[in-house]
Regions:
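Acidic, polar low-complexity linker/tail segments
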Residues: 9-12, 30-34, 311-364, 371-379
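Periplasmic-binding protein-like
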Residues: 166, 290-314
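N-terminal segment of the mature folded domain
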Residues: 37-157, 161-164
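Ligand-binding pocket segment of bilobal, Venus flytrap-like solute-binding proteins
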Residues: 186-258
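A bilobed periplasmic-binding-protein/Venus flytrap-type ligand-binding module shared by bacterial periplasmic
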Residues: 126-133, 266-284, 301-305
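Von Willebrand factor
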Residues: 356-421, 427-473, 501-511, 532-533
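VWA/integrin I-like adhesion module and closely mimicked acidic/polar interface patches used
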Residues: 251, 474-525, 535-537
Length: 541
């Protein structure tokens, strides 16, 4: 038998590879797009939903149903007030919106943008108090009114944490509900009612009970579970989930308070975004998904997650494992809802909260001016701080400081460099001037300025009168100073002040996470834009 000589194809493979490489280079130089995606999906075939973070647990059911009807469903989650901003800026990317409360659809600049809105389930926003604390206050198995909560706060017997009034749905609707009830539960809240001095004093007293504020509802849950707090305001379904976790760990659950004179109820509407009214197939897909969300199977699924679907929240046959009576949840009682005011009144009420009602804050910004910040980094820092501190700029996004707020600036490199302070939170011209003349140089030490910030807050701030926050921005690894010095100071002084951090450049996130874990805080990503990061962290104080 004669063996045939095997051909060597290696040279041919090399030649073909070279030709393909040459082809790609030439086409790229011509500016053509070579996106050969084997999993390519026509954008027109995708059904995009912009949805509240409160619905994220239901994503897979919606996506699976989309597959059943031949629709590729993509869901993006944001905070409710952020959804309003996104849709006002550009709604063309989305086909439907699932938001926590219909009032935010009314806040859209284009009142004709959404159609076919229907409530899917309802979700009250209430206060949960450790049951032993609620018993001591006389709230267990009793009719509780909003004035009872107010009196407990005034007497120093009740403190709580909540999410931002100006950046989250739970914060905003809880505020509007309490505002409405303290105004005497009128048929409709008016602008004139917002001018009542007694009402303003009651609201200031209510917010004096705030210990911490979160910029989003999800982090509020983490803050509570990781901290030493005994009350919080949140969604009913979230408080149920928290109680399930607490009891599974052998810890004391929260007792939910439903004031008989009114609670904030969210109707969670699912609505069509009519960007292209001629696309009948798209609208048909929307109607199918909406009908599925309102189907018995999905309603049962959502009830098991702690959402209600019954008129007035009443259902004597509700799942008692989820809607546990021992946690203060009584589904045989009608929930007294409020009628939300007009768009104009809501806007005025939010501005009133910022300027006059919320508990003042003292924020210490620790700003890295080490040598690595030279150039673009320092320029971005100056722009971001000017935006946050300038009243006119910040007020466009409801981020402005009020007259009663305090602001301190600690600049640092390998040591604390300078300290600047404001007497009034809305008079920041001198601080902005000093920031814009900062020079970069030296090494990086994030620990000494953090201790300095805590010292400033301890020496100048009363916990009962102010919320306290440290915001640290750095672009590098701390090569001097010691984390253990911060840890020692924090524990010796029984600190509870959050130390938030913003990453930039080549900052060492592990060092920043240590500070966040120590103080029950979090780290924000400023690498894609310092201005956006400072805006986000601002909503946490």
């Amino acid at each position: 038998m004669v063996k045939r000589k095997r051909k060597n194809n290696f040279g041919i493979v090399i030649f073909i590879g070279f030709v393909i490489y040459f082809f790609v280079i030439v086409i790229s130089e011509m500016g053509l797009d070579l996106d050969f995606d084997l999993n390519y999906t026509n954008e027109d075939e995708i059904f995009r939903i912009i949805s509240s973070t409160s619905t994220s647990k239901l994503d897979q059911e919606i996506i699976d149903y989309g597959e059943e009807i031949g629709v590729d469903v993509v869901i993006e989650h944001y905070g409710d007030l952020e959804i309003v901003d996104i849709l006002n800026e550009d709604s063309s990317k989305y086909d439907a919106v699932w938001i926590s409360n219909s009032i935010w659809l009314y806040m859209l600049e284009n009142s004709y943008l959404v159609t076919d809105s229907k409530s899917i389930v309802i979700n009250p926003v209430v206060m949960g108090i450790e049951k032993s604390k609620a018993e001591a206050l006389g709230f267990v198995n009793k009719d509780v009114y909003n004035k009872d909560l107010l009196n407990a706060i005034k007497e120093g017997k009740l403190k709580y944490i909540m999410s931002s009034v100006t950046k989250t749905n739970t914060g905003a609707t809880a505020y509007l509900s309490f505002l409405n009830n303290m105004a005497g539960s009128p048929e409709v809240l008016t602008e004139e009612m917002l001018k009542d001095e007694k009402l303003a004093e009651d609201l200031k007293a209510f917010f004096k009970g705030v210990q911490r504020v979160s910029g989003d509802e999800e982090y509020l849950t983490d803050m509570f579970l990781n901290g030493d707090y005994n009350a919080m305001i949140n969604y009913e379904n979230t408080l149920i989930e928290i109680n399930q976790k607490l009891t599974s760990e052998g810890k004391e659950p929260l007792y939910l308070i439903y004031p008989v004179d009114g609670v904030a109820i969210n109707d969670m509407p699912f609505a069509y975004i009519s960007n292209n009214s001629s696309n009948t197939e798209n609208r048909e897909n929307f109607l199918k998904i909406q009908a599925y969300l309102r189907s018995e199977a999905m309603i049962n699924k959502m009830q098991n997650e702690g959402f209600r679907s019954w008129y007035g929240g009443v259902n004597p046959n509700a799942n008692q494992t989820t809607f546990n009576k021992d946690w203060g949840i009584d589904t045989t009682k009608y929930l007294n809802d409020m009628k939300y005011p007009s768009k104009t009144v809501i806007t005025k009420a939010l501005n009133l909260y910022i300027e006059a009602l919320r508990k003042p804050t003292h924020v210490v910004f620790c700003l890295d001016v080490s040598g690595s910040m030279s150039g673009t980094g320092l320029d971005e820092l100056k722009e971001a701080m000017t935006y946050i501190l300038d009243y006119e700029q910040a007020s466009k996004d409801n981020l402005q400081f009020s007259e009663k707020d305090k602001i301190s600036i600690v600049t640092f490199n390998d040591e604390v460099a300078r300290v600047y302070e404001t007497k009034y939170g809305n008079q920041t011209q001198d601080v902005i001037y000093n920031i814009n003349y900062l020079m970069a140089g030296g090494g990086t030490n994030i620990y000494d300025p953090t201790i300095e910030a805590l010292r400033i807050l301890n020496s100048e701030t009363d916990d009962e009168e102010y919320t306290k926050t440290v915001i640290l921005m750095t672009d590098g690894e701390s090569n001097t100073g010691s984390y253990y010095d911060v840890q020692k100071y924090y524990h010796m002084n029984e600190e509870t002040t959050p130390i938030y951090s913003i990453t930039f450049g080549y900052s060492d996130e592990s060092q920043l996470r240590q500070l966040a874990e120590l103080s029950n805080a979090k780290v924000f990503d400023g690498k894609s834009g310092l201005k956006e990061a400072f805006a986000e962290v601002r909503s946490y104080n």
